[in-house]
Amino acid sequence: MARHGDTRSPSPVGSTHSSSRRSRRDDDRYERTKRDDGRSYRRSRSPERRYRERDRESYRRRERSIARRDDYRDEDSYRPIRRDRSRDRRRSRDRGDDRDYRRRSRERDFRCRRDDSRDRARRRADDSTDLKHKSRRDSSRDRPKDSASRSRETSKPATPAPTAVPTDEEKRAERLAKLEAWKQKQAAERERKQREAAAAGGARSLLDEIDRKSGLSPAVGSPQSPATPSTTADATPAPYAGKFDPKAIAKSAAPAQAASNVLGDDVAVPTAVKASATSTTTKVQANKPSTASKASAPLKAKGVVGRFGLGTKQAADMEKSSATKTLGFGEEESTRRKLERLPTPPLDDANDTNKPEDNAEDDDDVDMHEGDTEEQTAAAARAAAERREERLQNEASKTNGDTTMNDAPHSQEGEKMEVDAKEEEEIDPLDAFMSELVETAPPKKTTGAKFSKAKEQQPEAIFGDENDPDITAVGEGDADDFLAIANKAKKKKDIPKVDHAKMEYEPFRKKFYTEPSDLAQMSEGELASLRLELDGIKVRGVDVPKPVQKWSQCGLGVQTLDVIDRLGYENPTSIQSQAIPAIMSGRDVIGVAKTGSGKTVAFLIPMFRHIKDQRPLENMEGPIGLIMTPTRELATQIHKDCKPFLKALNLRAVCAYGGAPIKDQIAELKRGAEIVVCTPGRMIDLLAANAGRVTNLRRVTYVVLDEADRMFDMGFEPQVMKIMANVRPDRQTVLFSATFPRNMEALARKTLNKPVEIVVGGKSVVAPEITQIVEVRNEDKKFVRLLELLGNLYSSDENEDARALIFVERQEAADTLLRELMRKGYPCMSIHGGKDQIDRDSTIEDFKAGIFPVLIATSVAARGLDVKQLKLVVNYDAPNHLEDYVHRAGRTGRAGNTGTAVTFLTEDQERFSVDIAKALKQSGQKVPEPVQQMVDSFLEKVKAGKEKASASGFGGKGLERLDQERDAARMRERRTYKTGEEGEEEEEKEEKNEQAEERFNKVLSSVQSASAPSLPGVPKGIDLDGKITVHRTEKDANGAKNPLDKVGSAVADIHARLSRAGVMRSGVPIDNRGPDAGAFHATLEINDFPQKARWAVTNRTNVAKILEATGTSITTKGSFYPTGKEPGPGENPKLYILVEGETELAVTNAMRELMRLLKEGTLAAADSDARAPVGGRYNVV
C-alpha cells in the first residue's frame, strides 16, 4: 500500500519537485507485486537514506522517473505473469518444469517469511559494489525471472511471443551450448588476463575488474530485440567518456516513456545482432585487466533488454561502473570508507531514473546480502568462486552429460554466467562458509588485483573448533589438583616456605665479645674453681668462653650499662656470667638454670648489642630479634623487662600473643619494630595475615626460645619449626629453660648449630632459698590447713604487703576455691585458661600491684610470673611431675629472696609422691616420713606390676583422644593397604578378648539396670545411667586364611541374602559391615520411650550438635512399634539409634550425650503428663 503523500497517477515529466518527492517516498514502499520476490523494493545501488523532513528541500537525485513507476503494471504482459509468481513458495520445492529441482537456499526460505526490507536497507548501503556481484542469491540458486524475461532469454530469434515457456530439452541444449562456447572463450581469456596482469597495478586493477564485470553485463544477459539496430550496440561505450546532465536525462525520459506505452511488450533479439553486441563489449573490455581467480565472479546475467533498447541499458551499466570506481574499496574496508563518502554521491547515477530494467538488476544486487553479514557473504563468495573455477576445469565434460554441443548461438560470457549460476546453485553458502573455516583456501594466482584485507578475515573462524578453549569437566581433570586448591583455601594460617637458596640476605655480624685480659690470663684450675663458685656451672661444647664476673667485662655499650645500673643489677648471676659471653661470641646456646636466676636478661642484653650493630629498619621490614614463649603471661613479662632498655637504645618492641585483638598488633608491626615477643600461634597468624604483607622474617638474625621444653611439649613443635624454617639458616639461636628433659634435647638440637650447653645448679632443681613443706592430708582438711597458712602469713606486720599464690589442678577447682576464700574474707582472684586474655592480663597486673593479695591459678601461671613480694606458694592439688613442681615452687624466692612452698598430698596420690621426694632430695632438703612411706608403697606396687612408673617431663594431659585417633588412622591405613597375610592371629586373639569383655559388660549392665530404680517412662531393661557398651566393628569373614572357611562364609552369606533372614530381625546385631562402617559402634533402642524423648534424640538440631562435638555418625534405624507390639520374623527391628565412630572414646561420648537427652526428654514428658488436667476442656452436662 502506498504511503502517505503518494499518488497513483503518473506526474508530468517536467515536474521535478513532485518527481523527486515521489522518488524519495518510493524508498519506503514495498510493492504488492514484489511481495513474494524475496528481494528488496529499492531499485538503486545508491545508499539508502531515511526519509526525514529536513531532506525535502535538499538535493536528492531521482531513483526512477515517477512517470514510469507503474509501467510494470501493464495488464497484458506483467500482471498476469506476476500472478504466477505470487503464490506462497513455501508450499512445494517443485515450482515448475523449468526448474532443475535444485536445492533451495535455506536463507531465502527464511527471508521470504518476513518483511525485513527496512532492516536490509542499512546493510546493503554499506556493501561495496564489488561484493554485490558475489551475492548469496547468485551462489545459492538462479532466481526465477518473470515470465516475460524467461521468454526473452530462451526463445528463438524468430519467436516474438514473450509468454512462450521453453521445454526442459530446449533449455538443457541451450545451457550445454553455452558451456562449450565458454570453454573455448576461457582459454583465450586466460592468456589475455595473464598478459594484462603483468602490466596492471594493484588497486586500479581491482576497480577496472569491477568495471569490466559491470560493463559486460548488458551484452551477456539476454538476447537483443530484433527491432534494435546493431549500430546501437556499437555506439554504446561512447556516451560514458564524461558525466551527464541530470536535467537532460530527465527530458529524454519522456519519449522513452511514450515508446513504452505504445509497444507494451518486449521484442526478441535476432542472432545476428547478438554477435555484434558481443564483439562490441569485448572491445570495451580489451584494455581492462582482470583477476584470474575472479573470472567467474559475475554469477548472473544482468543484461535484461527492456523496451528502451540496449543503449539505455549499457549506459546505466557504465554509469554504475563509474560509481564503482568511486565507492568500491574492498571487503571490510569499504564499510568504513563508504560511510564517509555516501553523503555526496556522484551525479553519474542520476540517469538511473530512466531505466526500470536497471532497477530490476539493482534488486538482484541488493538481494545478495539479505539475512546475513557482509563478512560471511564475502567469504562464501570467494570460496565458491575459487572452487567453481577448479571444478569447471576438471569436470567440464561431466555436466549432465551435455557437453557435446558446439554451436552456441549466444554470447560466451552469458553462457559462462549461466553455467556458473547453475554450478553455484549446488553449493549452499553456509556449507561454503563453514568449509572455508576448516579447509585452507587454495592459493590465489598473483595478479594486479588483490584484497588487502583477505588475511585479516582468516581469524573469523569463530565457529571452528581448532581455536576453541579446552573446556573439560572438573571430574575429568586432575582431581588431586582440585582438592589441593580447595585445601589451600582452607588453610588460612599456612605461611609459604622460603627457598633460602634463592634469597639474597644481607651479611651480619655475630661476634662482639673480646675476652678481657684478666680472664685470658686465668688458668684451667682457676677457671674450674670459678665455675664451681658460680653455682656449679657445667658447660659442654667446643671452645666455650670463660664466665665474666663484672658487667664491664661483657663489652656492652654505655647506654646499656646505665640502664643496668639504674635497675640495680650489681653483678651478673651465674647463668648471666656464662651465657652472655657465649652468646656475644656468636655461638648458639642452650641455657638451663633454676627459676629466678635472671635468664631473661641473659638473652636480652646480647640481643640489644646484636640489633644495634645492624642498619636501621626501613619501611615494611620485619624484626631483627624474635623471642618466642609458650604462654601469654611469659610473653608480657619479657616485653616488660625489655622496656627500660628500649627507651635508652631507641628501639621498638611488639608483644604479640593470642586473645588480644590482632589489629592492634598489626598496626604496631606496620609502624616497625626491631624486637617481637610472641607466642608461636599468633606469630603464624601475623605472618599469614594480608597475604604476608604485615610482617616478614627476612631480617631476623637472632631467635630466642624461652621455656623451650614447655613450648615443644605443649604441641607447639609444628608451629615453632615452621617459623624457624622461614628464618635465614645462618641465624643465631638461643634456648633457655629451667628444666630440660632429655627427650627435649633432640628436638632442640634440630634448630641449633653446634650449640654450647650451659647448665647452672643442675637440671630441675628448686632454689635453696625456698623452704619446701610437703604434707599428707585428706581432701576435707586441706582447706582448713590453707586458711591456717594464710592466717600465719598475714599475722605479722612485715608480711602486710606479701602475696600468696595457690595452685590447683582444674579450672572448676579454681573457681570453687575462689568462692570459698571470698566467703572467709580473703580478697582474691582466679586465673586459668578458660578466662579471656584481657581478664588474665588485668588479674596479673592487679596481683602485682597488691590490689588483692591472694591469687588462685592453674599451671598456666606457673611460668613467667615474677612477683617480688610473693612469699607463699601453696600446691593445693599436687603437681603430677617433677618439672611442674619445680616451676610452681620457683614462683617464690626469686632474685635471692626467701619464700615458702607448701604442697598437699592425699593418700591416693602415691604416684606424685615419687617426683616430689626426688625434688626435695635434689634441693638438699629432708623428705618427710609420710611422704617417704608413700614413695616406698608405690615402688612396691611397681615391682609387683600393679602400677606403672610415670616418666618425667611434660607428658601432657587430655590427649587420649588424639592417641586413639592416631591409632585409628594407623589401623585404617593397615586395613587399606594390607595384603591379607600379616597380623591375622593377633587380631583374632584381640577379637576373642573383646568378645569376652563384651559378654561380661552386658551381664554387668543388666544386673545394674535391674537393681537401679527406673525413671518414670523409661522402658524396662534400659538403664540410662549404666555402662555404655561400644562394639568393635565385625571383621569380614573373607580375611580368613583357610579356604574352606571362606567357602563356608560365602555360602552362609548367599543363604542370608536369599532368605532375608537374619538381616533386619529383632535381636540381631545391626548391619554395619559396609565400606563406610566405623571402627566402633553402639546402639540405643528408643522405640519404647515417650514421644518427647524420641524427638529429643532424633531432631536435627540436637543430632548436629553431637556430630560436631564428637565426629561420629548417628543414624536412626528400624521401625516404630506401638507399646505391646513386637516385630515378627523378617520384619524390621524396633526403632533404635546407631552410633559409629573411629574411636571408642568418640562413640562413648556420643552415646552419653544421647542418653542425657533421652533422660531429659523422659522427665519432661512425665512432668507434662503430671500437669495435664484429668478431664477434657469441656464437660458434657
UniProtKB/Swiss-Prot annotation:
One of its GO terms (molecular function) is ATP binding. Residues 580-758 form the Helicase ATP-binding domain. Residues 785-935 form the Helicase C-terminal domain. Residues 157-166, 222-243, 275-284 have a biased composition (Low complexity). A motif (DEAD box) lies at residues 706-709. Its EC number is 3.6.4.13. Residues 1-243, 275-423, 949-998 are annotated as: Disordered. ATP binds at residues 593-600. Its main location: nucleus. It comes from the Eukaryota. Keywords: ATP-binding, Helicase, Hydrolase, mRNA processing, mRNA splicing, Nucleotide-binding, Nucleus. It catalyses: ATP + H2O = ADP + phosphate + H(+). Residues 24-87, 94-155, 168-196, 384-393, 410-420, 958-981 have a biased composition (Basic and acidic residues). SMART domains: DEXDc, HELICc. Pfam families: DEAD (PF00270), Helicase_C (PF00271), KH_12 (PF23469). One of its GO terms (cellular component) is nucleus. The keyword Nucleotide-binding applies. SUPFAM superfamilies: P-loop containing nucleoside triphosphate hydrolases. Residues 359-375 have a biased composition (Acidic residues). One of its GO terms (biological process) is mRNA processing. A motif (Q motif) lies at residues 549-577. It is found in: Nucleus. ATP-dependent RNA helicase involved spliceosome assembly and in nuclear splicing. Catalyzes an ATP-dependent conformational change of U2 snRNP. Bridges U1 and U2 snRNPs and enables stable U2 snRNP association with intron RNA. Belongs to the DEAD box helicase family. DDX46/PRP5 subfamily. The Q motif is unique to and characteristic of the DEAD box family of RNA helicases and controls ATP binding and hydrolysis. This is Pre-mRNA-processing ATP-dependent RNA helicase prp5. It comes from Aspergillus terreus (strain NIH 2624 / FGSC A1156). The gene is prp5.
